[in-house]
A protein has these predicted regions:
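N-proximal low-complexity "stem/linker" segments adjacent to membrane-targeting elements
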Residues: 1-27
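Short loop->beta transition adjacent to catalytic acidic/histidine clusters or analogous donor-positioning motifs
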Residues: 4-5, 27-39, 56
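C-terminal catalytic/acceptor-binding lobe
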Residues: 5-11, 172-303
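Short, charged/polar "capping" segments at the starts of alpha-helices
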Residues: 16-18, 45-50, 125-128
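Anion (oxyanion) recognition and catalysis
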Residues: 30, 52, 188
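Short, hydrophobic beta-strand segments that form beta-sheet elements in well-ordered domains
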Residues: 36-43, 117-118
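Active-site-proximal specificity loops/subdomain of glycosyltransferases
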Residues: 40-91, 98-99
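Conserved catalytic core of nucleotide-sugar-dependent glycosyltransferases
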Residues: 80, 96-181, 185
């Protein structure tokens, strides 16, 4: 499948700790088998050097919004023009991919002619460069299972899809809230199967700060770019997340149809809220706060 998959990414500047974890992530992509084509976008510091040293394709120019943030539409468009691959995967540049990634994509492709494959990240504190000259994956995955924290269903860090899936993409700013939910919504609205690959191919998100964004994390989630992305996302009774996946790729490679995951989680959260409210007198006597009780509430299971 080497010629059939192209991974595309828009890294941040390769400076300090973010430079270390991006180099870790992108190097891991070169180790999956068969090796995919990899396209790195942007003029950010260190991008060209990283591409040259790892034998990647580098496309320097990319359309940006008024704040200088790259636009998803141009990245998708340029990738399909520059590569002959049948499949593409947009991956955030701090995500370490396991060897099972390409195998998972192949399973999904054999089942569906059209699809969107996504996955939840597991957050892990990684401070040093990984040594890829030895068996790096097994120790890292063991540490991930021991120390990592599985992100919520909103933590979507890759999108894999066949050529021609995304057309008429609005000017969404990448790395800002709502751009990833838009990708899931687009597929679901068109009847395209959305496959959650998390159980089969766990991905590692290396934790980092938000110093690369002028307004910090607040700008990413609640700044004007987030507001603009929400406008392009459109009306919503709810956000499309990994809970909106129609299928789940199991650890044994089987595809399981999923129903009503979002609705079940919403019902559990509503029931827990009712429990918290009804037990207020008892909790008050015990000195338990509502916020602490809610924080201990129902967690997602198997989603």
């Amino acid at each position: 499948m080497a010629a059939d998959l192209t991974i595309i990414a828009m890294p941040k500047p390769f400076v300090g700790h973010i430079g270390v974890i991006q180099r870790n992530a992108i190097t891991s992509w070169t180790k999956v088998h068969p090796r995919p084509e990899i396209i790195i976008f942007g003029t950010e510091q260190g991008a060209a050097d990283c591409a040259a040293s790892l034998g990647l394709v580098h496309i320097s120019e990319v359309a940006r919004n008024q704040y200088g943030t790259p636009l998803l539409a141009d990245i998708f468009s340029q990738a399909e023009k520059s590569s002959a691959s049948a499949l593409f995967a947009y991956v955030n540049a701090d995500i370490i991919l396991p060897a099972s990634f390409t195998a998972g994509i192949e399973i999904v492709r054999k089942k569906f002619s059209q699809f969107l494959a996504v996955g939840r990240r597991t957050n892990l504190d990684v401070r040093e460069p990984l040594d890829f000259s030895v068996d790096w994956e097994s120790p890292l995955l063991k540490r991930m299972r021991r120390e990592g924290q599985l992100e919520s269903h909103t933590g979507i860090d890759f999108f894999a899809f066949p050529r021609g899936t995304y057309v008429d993409v609005p000017p969404l700013a990448i790395g800002r809230v709502w751009f990833d939910q838009w990708c899931v919504k687009y597929a679901r609205k068109r009847g395209i199967p959305v496959v959650d690959m998390t159980p089969f191919s766990p991905i590692v998100h290396q934790l980092h700060h938000y110093d690369h964004v002028a307004g910090g994390k607040q700008w990413v989630y609640a700044g004007p770019e987030a507001d603009e992305n929400l406008v392009y996302y459109g009306s919503r009774p709810h956000a499309y997340t990994i809970l909106s996946a129609t299928h789940e790729l199991q650890p044994d490679g089987g595809l399981k149809r999923k129903f009503f995951r979002r609705e079940v989680l919403a019902a559990r959260e509503w029931a827990w809220e009712m429990f918290v409210n009804k037990t207020h007198p008892l909790r008050k006597r015990l000195g338990l706060s509502k916020s602490a009780t809610l924080a201990a509430g129902p967690k997602e299971r198997g989603s």
